[in-house]
Structure formats: C-alpha cells, structure tokens
C-alpha cells in the first residue's frame, strides 16, 4: 500500500517537473518579432526586433560557416548588400534559421543642368552608366549608391558593375 502511495507521489512530481521544464524552455526561446521569415525587400537597411536573445548571427550560407555576429539591442538596424541571407537569434537557446533576401534595384535619376545632365544612382547597387549621343557610345562612368556624375549625352543605360 505504501509503495503505491509513493509511486503516485513520484508520478505527480515527474509530471509537474515536465510541465515546469516545458514552460522554462518556451520562456528562454528567442522571440523573433521582425523581420518575418522569407522576407524580401530592395531596402538595404533591415530592422531586427528580437527579444530573449543576446546575439544575432547572419550568414550567406545555411551552415553558418562565416557568420557576422551582432550584439542585440533595441531597434537594431543592419545595412546589408543585395543577396540572400540566413539568420538566427542566439540566447540560452537558438531560434530557428530564417531567410532574408535583399533584391538588387537599378534606378537612375536624371537632372538637367544647363547643357549637361547629372546622373544619380538612387538604387541599391553600384552601376556602370553608358552615355550615348544618338547611337554612339560617348562615355562610361561608374556611379556608386547615392552618388552623382555629370555627363553629356542624350541616352543613358545603367549596367551592373
């Protein structure tokens, strides 16, 4: 009779311990708020909002062989180049691996300036700009992201560097 009573007490203790352990595991898992998994954008500055984690690992390969590590702080913004990235939050436990894709955006803005044009790269990737007069190629210039070049011509083509 005593053995059955002790067995019941042991069973209750095991069940309570398992419930507490499962709750603790859920409590220490990193909580990823943003960005969403499989997020795609052409913006290069990404806002990471993560709770219950100490660090963020970002890599361009799924094995995380050469990750960049960032200390997590409220409103962490990271500037990334176009490409596909894998990332995870690390605390007591690790979050699941998520993906993030930054698409290349080619975008030239022209401003007429007297006899010339100012060509501004408002995309997110460096460009080679071919300048034409009619059908003749007259100049090639390199324009970095946010940079501007003064050119003379009547046709302009942005090409990936």
Protein language model annotation of sequence segments:
Residues 8-27:
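Hydrophobic membrane-insertion alpha-helices, especially the h-region
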Residues 55-61, 130-134:
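Predominantly extracellular/luminal cell-surface or secreted proteins
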Residues 77-86, 148-156:
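Surface-exposed, short loops/turns at beta-strand junctions within beta-sandwich domains
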Residues 92-104:
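Extracellular fibronectin type III
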